[in-house]
Amino acid sequence: MKFITRFLCVPVAGLLALTSCAKDEDESYVQFENQALEAWMTQHRSDLVQNYQSDGGYYIDLIEAGDQSLDPIGKEPIWVSFDFTGRDLAGNIILTRNADSARLAGTFSKYTHYVPFYRYCGTENTGLMEGTWLAMRNTLKLGEKYYNANKDRLGLRSPELQLRYGTKIQLYMPSSVVGNGVEGTGGYEGQYTLSSKRPFIVTMEIRDTVNNPLEREGGDVDGFCDD
């Protein structure tokens, strides 16, 4: 009986050891990538290093603050309409919902209707890239130096902000809040794909909040066809 017990314990112990090793490797890679992204930001976008968001480990560049008289989109669960263009660290466009960006990438097609994404943004993430969901739901923080240099241009009164209608922002994200590789589909692709475990730069602009996205998009498509 003791022999059988020892016999059964050996593979279980081995499985636990392998699981522990895999977890340690994943955690080590995340730490390595975060350090590598920080080094890249320090070299290429040192002005954004203080704009680090601890929940998600990404950096932000606020291009336009949006209409500050309106409620932030994270106030309650809602469907959000937003333009989206994603690039790798070399600046190559991976996917885009923007016609001008598609022309820049050389992938524009007159048969593609370039409309914003419609995604549900709730208290739990069900359909958004993790980093974009975190940016939509959380209060973001700007570094003191960045805030002082840009507050007048952006019309800000606080280094803390939330996304709302008209906000245009760039996110520099580690793969941990991106997913396992990225590529465009359905005419929205760029000239490249993003391999897994690679950082991703997303430029997004909040275009609207939508109660019925199917009805809205159907109307947009009908208008496009009429034109």
Predicted regions: what they are:
Residues 21-227:
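Cross-family detector of peptidyl-prolyl cis-trans isomerase
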Residues 1-21:
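Sec-dependent bacterial lipoprotein signal peptides
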